[in-house]
Swiss-Prot record:
Its main location: nucleus. Disruption phenotype: Leads to light-independent loss of conidiation and impairs formation of perithecia. Completely impairs the expression of cellulases, xylanases and the cellulase regulator XYR1. A motif (Nuclear localization signal) lies at residues 40-45. This is Developmental and secondary metabolism regulator VEL1. Belongs to the velvet family. VeA subfamily. It comes from Hypocrea jecorina (strain QM6a). Residues 291-310, 341-351, 379-389, 458-475 have a biased composition (Pro residues). It is found in: Nucleus; Cytoplasm. Residues 432-448 have a biased composition (Polar residues). The gene is VEL1. Induction: Expression is regulated by light and darkness, but this regulation is further modulated by the carbon source in relation to the growth rate. Expression is under the control of LAE1. Residues 230-245 have a biased composition (Basic and acidic residues). The lineage of its organism: Eukaryota, Fungi, Dikarya, Ascomycota, Pezizomycotina.
Length: 573
């Protein structure tokens, strides 16, 4: 007769239950059941036909361990689980974890217990891990209704050998068969509705260990917990998808509307080193430099009518050699160095204004010439000018068209003339700013304050100015730089030319390659084709129209539309 033993209290989550039984041969057997894995949560699967196929198993699956010990006590006995010849199975049932008070009126819902679906019975599996024992696994247990429940497992034994029967059978009238041995209960767990279910957890290490040994257990590698964002109830699938997209997709950075595209002009890199070293200018020139008008008048020419004294400067690159150079690159300027006394405004002044009496009215113009010669020494770099870029493009597209002086000098002349100097650009040795000597102001010249960021100029009123002789030529200058010059344009005035106001004609279309269009090679026949007809080849040779080639020849179409003939080699079969 099996007698229940005292339940061993344990501080862990495992619950242990033991019984003691004496067989006919006076063998003392101890049965010990341990719930190794307690159920924690489940989702109610509901009722109906859909609930039969859409199972919601208890998570994690319950696992119960059975040990059979033979001896006077559990501590002194021997484990005979693998040697004992009998069959065991464990049956699971569901019961309420809270005591329900019965009312006066008994209805059907009160009498019926909670419904447990799935596979409630489990046979014993002999496993080596985690320890050598018998295990009952319930991977397919579902609950139909939500609530607070616990599972109750009943152990049944089918005895095979007569010596292992009970010493005192429970009912002598019945033949020996399946005997109920003991019962053990799990800890209470919650069954949630579909809206409140928090989700399935990752499979435990015990479930993975059992599954590795061949038992049927569902293994989940990832955590399928629901992200609720603080919501207590309700489940919105669209909200979950939106949350997943927000969690995984990185938003693109917002663009600043105040930022503009980078300019393609590299004029600032050339203009930067010369900003603190600009020569004196007229106040009107400085004001116009700060605020240039959108469409200035045509500039005056500095090559139109120089006096005869300036010719040696053009051909010999400077007259007197007693004046030190002010800039490295402008020293080799082979054009536009007229030297004369104060003359009407239409005539340019000396090449390099460094007089101590007063700044020249055209100091800004000559200084822009100097800067332009330095800029143009680098052919790919555009000129650094505050004038509108439309004027630069208009003059650069017409490099061979000269300009004539206006009726009065303009403070924007140098700004507009710089693009036209591309025809007379200095050779490459003068393009390096590091090779240019530092600009030095003579002692007799007034001092000006020139900040690095935006220069401001203060100059006395203009006075007659006598231009000194140009500086001596650089040692590296050669006469070969005179090749692009037109002496006639330097010594003879040109007729006045009005500013061009109409847009330039569109440039001619250039061929991008030798590939012909499809229409030039193949004929376009838009008629429908029937009975195996094909498109008509207009370039097919007239000599082969509708004829079959010789047996030893083949025809092929070339890329130019002609028909080629190839002769095959003669061979014997």
């Amino acid at each position: 007769m099996a007698t229940p033993s005292s339940v061993a209290s344990s501080s862990s989550r495992d619950q242990v239950q033991r019984i003691h039984r004496v067989t006919r041969e006076n063998r003392h057997l101890w049965y010990q059941l341990t719930v190794l894995q307690q159920p924690e949560r489940a989702r109610a699967c509901g009722s109906g036909m859909k609930a039969n196929s859409d199972r919601r198993p208890v998570d994690p699956p319950p696992v119960v361990e059975l040990r059979i010990i033979e001896g006077p006590s559990v501590e002194e006995g021997k484990d005979i689980t693998f040697d004992y010849n009998a069959n065991f199975f464990l049956y699971a049932s569901l019961e309420q974890a809270r005591t329900i008070a019965h009312g006066r009126v008994q209805n059907g819902a009160t009498n019926n217990p909670p419904i447990l679906t799935g596979v409630p019975a489990s046979g014993m599996a002999y496993l080596d891990r985690p320890t050598e024992a018998g295990y009952f696994i319930f991977p397919d247990l579902s609950v139909r209704h939500e609530g607070y429940f616990r599972l109750s497992f009943s152990l049944y034994e089918t005895t095979k050998e007569p010596k292992d029967f009970d010493l005192e059978p429970a009912d002598s009238d019945l033949p020996p068969g399946v005997d109920w041995r003991m019962e053990i209960k799990t800890q209470p767990f919650n069954v949630f509705s579909a809206k409140k279910f928090p989700g399935l957890m990752e499979s435990t290490s015990l479930s993975k260990t059992v599954a590795d040994q061949g038992c049927r257990v569902r293994i989940r590698r990832d955590v399928r917990m629901r992200k609720r964002d603080g919501k207590g109830s309700g489940f919105d699938r669209r909200g979950e998808e939106e949350y997943s997209r927000r969690r995984t997709v990185t938003p693109a950075p917002a663009e600043d509307p105040n930022l503009r595209a980078r300019s393609v002009s590299n004029a600032s890199e050339h203009r930067g080193p010369y900003m603190p070293q600009e020569p004196p200018r007229r106040p009107s020139a400085a004001e116009s430099y700060h605020a240039p008008p959108p469409l200035p008048p045509p500039p005056p020419s500095s090559y139109d009518a120089p006096p005869p004294a300036a010719r040696p400067g053009h051909l010999g690159f400077g007259g007197d050699h007693n004046m030190p150079p002010q800039y490295g690159a402008p020293a080799a300027r082979p054009y536009g160095h007229p030297q004369s006394a104060p003359i009407p405004p239409a005539t340019p002044t000396g090449p390099y204004p460094t007089s101590s009496a007063a700044p020249s009215p055209y100091a800004k113009q000559d200084h822009h010439h100097q800067q332009q010669y330095s800029y143009n020494s680098r052919p790919p770099a555009p000129s650094a000018s505050p004038a509108p870029p439309m004027k630069h493009a208009m003059y650069d597209n017409r490099p061979s068209e000269p300009y004539v002086p206006h009726s009065s000098p303009s403070v924007y002349a140098s700004t507009e003339r710089r693009p036209s100097y591309a025809n007379y650009s200095a050779p490459a040795p003068y393009s390096t700013p590091a090779s240019q000597p530092t600009y030095s102001t003579p002692a007799s010249q007034p001092t000006y304050s020139t900040p690095a960021s935006q220069p401001t100029y203060s100059a006395p009123p203009p006075a007659p100015y006598s231009a000194p002789a140009p500086p001596p030529p650089r040692p590296s200058m050669s006469q070969s730089s005179l090749a692009p010059l037109k002496i006639a344009s330097l010594v003879s005035p040109l007729p006045p030319i009005e500013a061009q106001t109409e847009p330039l004609p569109p440039p001619p279309m250039l061929s991008t390659g030798g590939k012909r269009k499809h229409d030039h090679v193949f004929s376009q026949n838009h008629k429908p084709l029937y009975n195996g007809q094909r498109q008509l080849d207009a370039h097919y040779g007239h000599g082969y129209r509708g004829l079959t080639p010789e047996p030893d020849q083949g025809l092929y179409s070339r890329a130019d539309g002609q028909i080629g003939v190839v002769t095959f080699n003669q061979y014997q079969v």
